[in-house]
Amino acid sequence: VYIPPRPISRPALIALLRVALRGDGNLLALLPAAAYRMEIGPLGWSRRQTLVVNRPELVRQVLLDPEGIFPKSDLMVNALAPLIGDSIFVSSGETWRRQRAMIDPSLTLMRVNRAFPAMEAGCAAAEATLAEHAARGGRFSLDLAMSHLTADIICRTVFSSGLEHQAAHDVFDAFTVFERCVAQVEIRRLIFDRAWTRVPQKPDVLEACRLIRGHLGALLDGHLAAGAGFDDIASKVIEARDLEGRGFTREELIDQLGVLFLAGHETSASALTWAFFILATQPALVARLRAEIREVVGEGPIGFEHTKRLTFVRNVFRETLRLYPPITFLPRIANEATRLGGTAVRRGALIMVAPWVLHRHRAYWRDPDVFDPDRFLPEREGEMTPGAYIPFGLGPRICAGAAFATIEAVLLIARLFRRFDVHVEAPEEVEPAARLTTRPVRQVMCRVTPAP
């Protein structure tokens, strides 16, 4: 039985006092033990009503939102607006519907059979880098390695160029600063501010956003100058038109391409960091993984057709997404007074649908904190509570890249662990934090050696 890192759950008042006194910016530290048992209830004490919603039918009500009562929260919009404007990730209503209709055709290029060569190229580059690390015996940051790898793949998919292109590498560097510094939820303000209070971003975050948008603009201008010279997602977004024949402006194009880069690499990097950490500390899992690869693939290269048959590898990734969902919280705001089940919801209330909590809920999962990939086997489907597993969201705003992310992860985990053993330094010191995505509090340092 293996229980990977998790925060200590405390009574609500103690959790609140620790956060307030220590200035802890990790929202996971604010979650009381009761959150993992309630169907719907308050997240400690705060000036604005803040509710954690766990009951699956209420989660569906909030995320499907047929009446438009629960748009994405002001906290999320304020945090991301300097980077991605009023783009598809944060917009709502008619604006979102127009953008989604325009962008959807471009996402056909994220279909895994089309994108698989980009994944293979990125994986080959990562193998070469890890081989250099193994030869030198040097230590490196697992977090940054996974971010670099997934950014390389999404750049190849969106812009037809990997991170060896200087502009793409500059975007990655600035995104790293942004991810480390952005304050989606500054907890003291969450506790004491009223709804719709604007939270100013830090100067280093705003500077990172300026750099990212500048570098994305340079990549975009290269595509605009080339005309029809590319067959990639960026070109399709450039060509997109709405029902009235209008395309995106240059600033809107930067908004949308920023979303694709952010969503296409940051979430995958989060999940892969945790998957690699878990496998690095559990040699029995790695042995099963390699045995499956030998059985399914043999000694040859891992192809697209193999990824669908690597069941254990896929279930390792699915279980990683359960315990470490990349998007820890899906915050919504109540635009009007309403009810969720028997609970009165005030206008301006912050509604926290939390995959982190839902995936560890005591009523919905057997041994919820245990890492158990076999819980996803067909013969154990009866243990699953419908609607209690939402790593890619739910409803019309479900992640359009879910299949892409899954095949990408299966390929990367299988190829890299087939060739290398990963050795994490001080694994007992690793702890999770809710930032832009679910990340370790401090960078996870590791070494690699050739697999036996």
Which ranges hold each PLM region?
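Cytochrome P450 heme-thiolate monooxygenase catalytic core
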Residues: 2-8, 72-77, 95, 111-270, ...
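Conserved cytochrome P450 K-helix/beta-meander segment immediately N-terminal to the heme-binding cysteine loop
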Residues: 353-381
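Cytochrome P450 proximal C-terminal region
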Residues: 35, 123, 127, 173-177, ...
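Cytochrome P450 I-helix active-site segment
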Residues: 7-11, 116-120, 171-177, 228-235, ...
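Conserved cytochrome P450 K-helix E-x-x-R motif and the immediately C-terminal K′/meander segment
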Residues: 17-38, 214, 218, 300-341
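N-terminal membrane-proximal hinge/A-helix region immediately C-terminal to the signal-anchor transmembrane segment
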Residues: 1-98, 118-125, 208, 336, ...
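Cytochrome P450 catalytic-core helices
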Residues: 267-292, 403-418
